[in-house]
């Protein structure tokens, strides 16, 4: 985490809104456990519709600025009220996103929630394995460089079994084999104006999409070789 993220977490961690079903997840929550990269934003998930009438005024009283999400228009077209599904704020230059887990695979994962608390506060942080599975789901749904890097670290640290990853990929993308997974990764394209991945806040060196992709493919190849030996 950046020092800015830590400062913002300290500002929000004891807010009354976190007495509801809200859980700290995403790349920053993952880095809290495995220290794999520098993370710059805060993601909060709820298995239920967001209580926006509580969240918005409390965040604004803290000095946070509410910003519009790029999916707002499509949510309205689908007959949904956007603030019930996603809320984004900027506080001290740190993005904070609250979102409702409205996809069936997310809902199923969050039926059995395990969590601890962040720094003994009101802010609940999901169990590492559940954070990682939500990250794997995100990896299959978008082409963000940080999702690709996090996916590689989940493989490297064996947080989610390769079999469980293939179960998720089969449900989302009909990918059920190592070969199909490799093709899926090879076909991934770098998003324009995507966020960067770096490992040290003090001496920052951004990793490229291509080098991260190559590293992830090597990790999958290593897993395949280990399976062949057993």
Q: PLM features: residue spans?
A:
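Compositionally biased terminal segments of proteins
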Residues: 1-230
